[in-house]
């Protein structure tokens, strides 16, 4: 793809069609900083964002996850060494997925994390889009597995890590 003005709508329509064809398109979000911003569900009940920032030749795929209050409570009771090891493990493991990430940490306790990856104009295909969506999701899932491993698996549905409505909220 070549992100020129005349092709903006074609790129937007192609990406939307690919997402809809695979049953993951949820809605178009209002975003003044983007040519388009789609909210998707991949897999079911996991909210992610597909965004083309204005003036950029890139599509950004992202997923924000809020850590469950029960996990935060368990982390608060952990030793400083356990907290530091957990944060180190999260960072080193996310790096293995070759994604970008931002950890929101307060007093050595993970509160939220955002995982993103980019597809540039010369690599935008349906295949690249879905491989990137899957990689971002698997990186997010890996963080949940690390949380469960280090601080206990929360079995009831209300207390597992959950998504904000959008990574930009």
Residues of each region from the PLM?
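Charge-rich, low-complexity N-terminal segments
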Residues: 1-58
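Solvent-exposed residues in well-ordered beta-strands and their adjoining turns
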Residues: 43, 64-66, 118-120
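Short, well-structured hydrophobic secondary-structure segments
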Residues: 46-76
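Glycine-rich, often proline-containing surface loops adjacent to acidic residues and nearby aromatics
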Residues: 57-61, 108-121
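Short, internal acidic amphipathic alpha-helical interface segments
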Residues: 65-112
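Ampiphathic alpha-helical segments that act as solvent-exposed interaction surfaces
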Residues: 78-98, 121-154
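Short, highly charged C-terminal tails/helix-capping segments
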Residues: 148-169
């Amino acid at each position: 793809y070549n992100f020129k003005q005349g092709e903006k709508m074609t790129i937007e329509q192609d990406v939307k069609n690919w997402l809809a064809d695979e049953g993951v398109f949820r809605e178009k979000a209002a975003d003044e900083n983007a040519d388009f911003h789609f909210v998707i569900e991949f897999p079911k009940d996991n909210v992610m964002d597909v965004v083309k920032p204005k003036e950029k030749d890139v599509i950004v795929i992202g997923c924000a996850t809020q850590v469950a209050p029960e996990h935060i409570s368990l982390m608060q009771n952990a030793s400083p060494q356990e907290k530091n090891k957990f944060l180190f493990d999260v960072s080193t493991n996310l790096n293995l997925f070759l994604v970008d990430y931002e950890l929101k940490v307060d007093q050595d306790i993970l509160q939220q994390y955002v995982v993103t990856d980019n597809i540039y104009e010369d690599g935008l295909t349906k295949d690249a889009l879905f491989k990137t969506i899957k990689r971002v999701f698997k990186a997010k899932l890996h963080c949940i597995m690390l949380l469960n491993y280090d601080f206990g698996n929360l079995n009831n549905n209300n207390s597992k890590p959950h998504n904000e409505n959008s990574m930009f909220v």
